[in-house]
């Protein structure tokens, strides 16, 4: 009897197991539905491609032309960059250059052989006119013999020159700052047309409203034919 019961239990278990497997098989089949789309189109960019590169199997006949264009663009960019760099470098160097105040203190070198005897030449120095006069022997003699007692601003001629033949003065009238005219006036030196001041060939005031002689700047003669002012 026990054998019959055992066989019945086994058959029941097999039926349950078989039923479970069938149910599980139905569940698996229900989850395996395909969700993929088969009507998608592969993107085609042929309309945007140049004719020369549409066929990848064909030899590219325009490669050299396109390379030349690329080289041209790179070269143009390099030239533009060089000009931009040049501007930046010039600006940087300009910011490091001497200021106007420093330049105003600069010296000036004058070649004396360019000034003939008896002539007065004007240069620009520190923003002002500079008179360089190559005096004649007669002018030197005349100015040396002037009594200082007769002068408004007493000063002997040898106090105003380093070399007798060269007079170096700033060409600004000591009255109101006008620029005198060379080789003019009652004393043949300088004449200020603004208010009528007369200076002699030593730059000393002789007549008119100017209170002082023309200023003599610092200068030297490093050699026989060169004058350095400043």
UniProtKB/Swiss-Prot annotation:
Biological process (GO), any one: mitochondrial electron transport, ubiquinol to cytochrome c
Protein family membership: Belongs to the Rieske iron-sulfur protein family.
Self-association and partners: Interacts with sloth1; the interaction is probably involved in the assembly and stability of the mitochondrial ubiquinol-cytochrome c reductase complex.
Cofactor note: Binds 1 [2Fe-2S] cluster per subunit.
Keyword GTP-binding: no
Residue ranges that the UniProt entry lists as topological domain Mitochondrial intermembrane: 86-230
Stretch forming the transit peptide: 1-35
Molecular function (Gene Ontology), one example: oxidoreductase activity
UniProt protein name: Cytochrome b-c1 complex subunit Rieske, mitochondrial
């Amino acid at each position: 009897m026990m054998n019959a019961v055992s066989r019945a239990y086994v058959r029941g278990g097999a039926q349950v197991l078989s039923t479970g497997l069938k149910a599980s098989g139905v569940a698996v089949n229900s989850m395996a539905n395909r969700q993929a789309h088969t009507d998608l189109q592969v993107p085609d960019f042929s309309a945007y491609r140049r004719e020369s590169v549409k066929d990848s199997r064909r030899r590219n006949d325009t490669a050299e032309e396109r390379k030349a264009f690329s080289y041209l663009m790179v070269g143009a960019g390099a030239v533009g960059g060089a000009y931009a760099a040049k501007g930046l470098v010039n600006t940087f160097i300009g910011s490091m250059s001497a200021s106007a105040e420093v330049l105003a203190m600069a010296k000036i070198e004058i070649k004396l052989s360019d000034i003939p005897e008896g002539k007065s030449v004007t240069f620009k120095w520190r923003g002002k006119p500079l008179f360089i006069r190559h005096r004649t022997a007669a002018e030197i003699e005349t100015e040396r013999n002037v009594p200082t007692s007769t002068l408004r601003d007493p000063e002997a001629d040898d106090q105003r020159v380093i070399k007798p033949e060269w007079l170096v003065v700033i060409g600004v009238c000591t009255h109101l700052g006008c620029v005198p005219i060379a080789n003019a006036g009652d004393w043949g030196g300088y004449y200020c047309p603004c208010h009528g001041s007369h200076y002699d060939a030593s730059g000393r005031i002789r007549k008119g409203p100017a209170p002082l002689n023309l200023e003599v700047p610092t200068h030297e003669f490093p050699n026989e034919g060169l004058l350095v002012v400043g």
